[in-house]
């Protein structure tokens, strides 16, 4: 039986692997092979495959039986190319051992350099190089790294010894130490290793090698790597490869160096060689921050004001070679590259290339410029941008150079940064805003009653609630930064203070919140403003040309509608009319309606609301022009509009001239144990049809008014919420149709409109065929459909959902990304049954899922006509919809 190939060699212009073998060789191994194949100077070496890592964990941390022989053969081949021999006393081959997963995981797993050094080979290296200091310096580095990575001995043990030696000899820098100093330190290092591990430092290079290989495979399961994988959705099953490579030394004197470079600026995307290097150093010195790195280009040196020479000046030949290679690599990989290199006695060697990590701003510029340079197509440019990353570009962000004094941290619930005075009451937020102040609203949690304060605030901070809490959803809808669930924060409404970590801040003090990271910062922190022109606009045009799915916005106010148009929305997919009722001048009329003893009294109160609603709808229709507007009839339970607590009830009763007891009794009467499943949605319209009639009249009169004014047809879409049966929809539609006839007769204008429903209950999804006989459109209310399908309250789920996702019970938070198997199945069933009965039925989703890239992809697969999301997430949905369309085309091809 043929043995499996576990080891892939590269060196001397030939390699067993290729760049498309990342799954087997990891990103680093595949790219080392590719660079070798295209003729770049890469030190010879070999890659042990990711399959060995999988075997290692499946077989109690042992290796396939034929691995050892393959490693020995590859080591011998590296020796032939370099003219050295591993473990040889006269001319030893030294190697590096590095990890390399499929997906780039910078700094997450372990590396060992200078492996093969021992008490004997260090003398041979000193003699061959003619530099004893270099040899001893390399050996002490190896002992430190190997002891930490393989033997588990903390760095501080070695740092203490080094600092003690420097103090006793009056040295300030590592470069002050000579060969004898390092030799003395090495003796102490080895003594410390034996003290800590109970064994002498290993002297056999082969034992060292297998120890390092095992440690690199072992590092796949260290905590920081596990955390990184979870944050970046990298499966544990992928495993890592191990790369063993002949050492080249950047610490062999003034003609040697080590560095890291990017082919374009990773922060801005500018097409310039960007990076840092250090003369007479090894790779870890650049990232460790022990010495200040030098600039690669002379231009960058001038900009930074550094007096240290650039690589361009200090090493002109190596710099010219690096420039040639960086251009060749970018052309070959058709993307911005992150390079690691070493210069050994004037010769440049490439140690790594990979697609470079970049900011969203840089990613946009790089994708558009690569397409303009004809290196990639426009469609490929569209697929290169992570839709969720656009969040970084649509809100002000904290200046990366700014100092951060962190007060407390919570969840990054709504992106962007905001700064203002601390306030604890929504009323005060509104008052101070009217006086020209900028405020941050701090609440334990928010409710619909706080909406005016949230609207007035620059940003919102809550101590309770998750990423899909009321505060988070409303803040995202408004495009306001929000940090939620800051559990260690204590808010005292009475004292008007907030306390975290022993620090107390008072009302009126300045606070900055970063909704992109969840950090809450003391004082005013500098910010950068978003720009939506240039590359952003170009890429959005390319995305729009590729997508089929329409993108609408959820908008409840004229400001929302204007933002929706600005971000490219193709209509309003959800206008929640209840948000219009919380303004101070309206809430009183709403409360009068709720307190009314009979229908006649309710109609009197509703008559006061009619002109206000009509004005709201007219403004929305005017802003949106010919684009569709879907208006949802009143949905929340009535008790949400009433005051809570004795003090507030007394205050409201006095302002209304009502009896406090009557108000208190009515509030108690309307109180529900489970309001989410209670007296709300179409149930209100059936029990109190006059509410739906008033709203329908306001919609139709506004449509007629705007149609006359603009001389363009306005066709509103009226959505009936929370229906479970066709009979419910039929009843409410009868009332809407009756009002439409009346308005048409009164205005002598035909009234065109559509009536549809929100599918947010499992029964409605299952009976979609029947419901489609009446409904002209369905909008899937995925927030409530998820709650009712799972039997989970969204506002209470934060306490346990993270446990579910961490343990793999659920792949992700179903309130963030649609649960394809359950909720998704209900959407699929409703789509099929609805279309069977009414071929031209319009289908979309409202709610926050409409702005989640994974959910948008699902909507495209199911064949919905549109998604609707908060205005600030519209560009994200547009890009995700384009990527979904391109993926479907690719699948068909």
Segments predicted by a language model, with ranges:
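Long, charged amphipathic helices and adjacent flexible linkers at domain junctions
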Residues: 69, 229-231, 382-439, 445, ...
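Short mixed-charge
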Residues: 77-88, 498-501, 708, 741-750
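A short, small-residue-rich loop immediately preceding and capping a beta-strand
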Residues: 458-464, 482, 844
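Nucleotide/phosphate-binding sheet-loop regions of phosphoryl- and nucleotidyl-transfer enzymes
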Residues: 1-405, 431, 437-440, 447-452, ...
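C-terminal accessory/binding modules appended to enzymatic or scaffolding proteins
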Residues: 14-21, 414-456, 823-840
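Short beta->alpha connector loops at strand-helix junctions that form conserved
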Residues: 46, 463-465, 484-487, 575, ...
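S4-like RNA-binding module at protein N-termini
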Residues: 70, 488-521, 526
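Conserved alpha/beta-domain cores
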Residues: 98-99, 532-535, 542-893
């Amino acid at each position: 039986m043929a043995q499996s190939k576990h080891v892939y060699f590269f060196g001397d212009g030939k390699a067993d692997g290729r760049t498309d073998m990342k799954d087997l060789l990891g990103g680093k191994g595949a790219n080392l092979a590719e660079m070798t194949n295209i003729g770049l100077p890469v030190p010879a070496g070999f890659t042990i495959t990711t399959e060995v890592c999988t075997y290692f964990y499946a077989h109690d941390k042992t290796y396939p039986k034929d691995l050892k022989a393959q490693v020995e053969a590859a080591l011998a081949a590296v020796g032939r190319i370099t003219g050295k021999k591993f473990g040889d006393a006269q001319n030893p081959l030294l190697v590096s051992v590095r990890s390399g997963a499929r997906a780039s995981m910078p700094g997450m797993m372990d590396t060992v350099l200078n492996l093969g050094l021992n008490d004997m080979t260090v003398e041979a290296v000193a003699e061959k190089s003619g530099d004893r200091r270099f040899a001893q310096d390399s050996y002490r580095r190896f002992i430190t790294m190997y002891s930490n990575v393989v033997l588990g001995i903390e760095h501080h043990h070695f740092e203490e010894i080094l600092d003690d030696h420097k103090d006793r000899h009056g040295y300030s820098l590592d470069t002050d130490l000579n060969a004898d100093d390092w030799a003395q330190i090495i003796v102490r290092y080895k003594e410390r290793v034996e003290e800590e591990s109970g064994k002498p430092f290993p002297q056999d290079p082969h034992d060292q090698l297998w120890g390092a290989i095992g440690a690199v495979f072992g590092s796949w399961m260290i905590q920081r790597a596990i955390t990184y994988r979870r944050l970046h959705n990298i499966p544990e099953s992928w495993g890592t490869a191990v790369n063993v490579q002949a050492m080249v030394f950047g610490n062999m004197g003034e003609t040697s160096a080590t560095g890291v470079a990017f082919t374009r600026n990773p922060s801005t995307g500018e097409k310039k060689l960007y990076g840092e290097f250090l003369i007479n150093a090894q790779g870890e010195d650049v990232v460790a921050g022990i010495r200040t790195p030098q600039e690669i280009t002379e231009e960058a040196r001038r900009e930074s004001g550094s007096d240290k020479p650039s690589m361009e000046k200090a090493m002109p030949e190596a710099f010219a070679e690096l420039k040639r290679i960086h251009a060749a690599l970018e052309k070959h990989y058709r993307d911005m590259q992150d390079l690691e290199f070493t210069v050994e006695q004037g010769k440049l060697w490439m140690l790594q290339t990979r697609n470079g990590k970049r900011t969203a701003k840089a990613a946009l510029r790089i994708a558009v410029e690569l397409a303009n340079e004809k290196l990639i197509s426009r469609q490929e440019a569209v697929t290169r941008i992570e839709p969720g990353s656009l969040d970084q570009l649509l809100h002000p962000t904290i200046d990366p150079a700014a100092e951060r004094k962190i007060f407390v941290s919570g969840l990054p619930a709504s992106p962007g940064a905001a700064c203002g005075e601390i306030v604890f009451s929504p009323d005060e937020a509104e008052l101070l805003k009217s006086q020209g102040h900028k405020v941050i609203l701090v609440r334990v949690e928010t409710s619909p009653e706080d909406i005016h304060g949230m609207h007035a605030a620059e940003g919102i901070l809550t101590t309770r609630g998750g990423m899909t809490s009321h505060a988070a959803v409303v803040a995202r809808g408004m495009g306001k930064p929000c940090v939620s669930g800051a559990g260690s924060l204590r808010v005292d409404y009475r004292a008007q203070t907030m306390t975290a970590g022993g620090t107390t801040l008072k009302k009126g003090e300045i606070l900055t919140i970063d909704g992109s990271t969840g950090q809450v910062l003391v004082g005013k922190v500098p910010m950068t403003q978003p720009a939506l022109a240039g590359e952003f606009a170009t890429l959005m045009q390319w995305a729009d040309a590729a997508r089929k799915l329409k993108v609408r916005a959820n908008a409840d106010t004229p400001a929302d509608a204007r933002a929706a148009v600005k971000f490219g929305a193709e209509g309003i997919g959800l206008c929640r009319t209840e948000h219009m009722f919380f303004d101070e001048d309206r809430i009183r009329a709403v409360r009068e309606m709720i307190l009314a003893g009979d229908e006649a009294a309710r109609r009197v109160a509703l008559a006061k609301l009619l002109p206000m609603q009509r004005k709201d709808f007219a403004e929305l229709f005017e802003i949106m022009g010919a684009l569709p507007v879907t208006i949802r009839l009143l949905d929340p339970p009535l008790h949400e509009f009433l005051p809570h607590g004795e003090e507030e009830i007394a205050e409201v009763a006095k302002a209304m001239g009502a009896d406090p007891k009557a108000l208190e009794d009515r509030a108690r009467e309307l109180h529900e144990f489970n309001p989410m499943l209670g007296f709300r949605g179409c149930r209100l319209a059936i029990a109190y049809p006059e509410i739906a009639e008033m709203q329908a009249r306001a919609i139709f009169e506004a449509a007629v008014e705007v149609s006359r004014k603009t001389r363009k047809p306005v066709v509103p879409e009226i959505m009936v919420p929370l229906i479970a049966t066709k009979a419910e929809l039929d009843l409410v539609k009868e009332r809407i149709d009756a009002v439409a006839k009346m308005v048409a007769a009164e205005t002598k204008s035909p009234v065109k409109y559509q009536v549809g429903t929100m599918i947010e209950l499992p029964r409605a999804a299952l009976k979609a065929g029947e419901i489609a006989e009446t409904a002209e459109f369905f909008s899937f209310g995925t927030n409530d459909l998820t709650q009712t399908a799972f039997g989970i309250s969204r506002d209470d789920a934060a306490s346990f959902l993270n446990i579910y996702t961490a343990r793999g019970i659920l792949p992700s938070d179903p309130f963030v990304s649609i649960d394809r198997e359950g909720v998704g199945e209900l959407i699929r069933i409703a789509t099929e049954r609805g279309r069977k009965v009414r071929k031209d039925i319009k289908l979309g989703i409202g709610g926050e899922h409409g702005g989640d890239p994974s959910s948008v992809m699902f909507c495209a697969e199911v064949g919905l006509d549109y998604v609707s999301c908060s205005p600030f997430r519209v560009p994200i949905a547009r890009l995700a919809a384009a990527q979904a369309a391109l993926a479907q085309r690719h699948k068909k091809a």
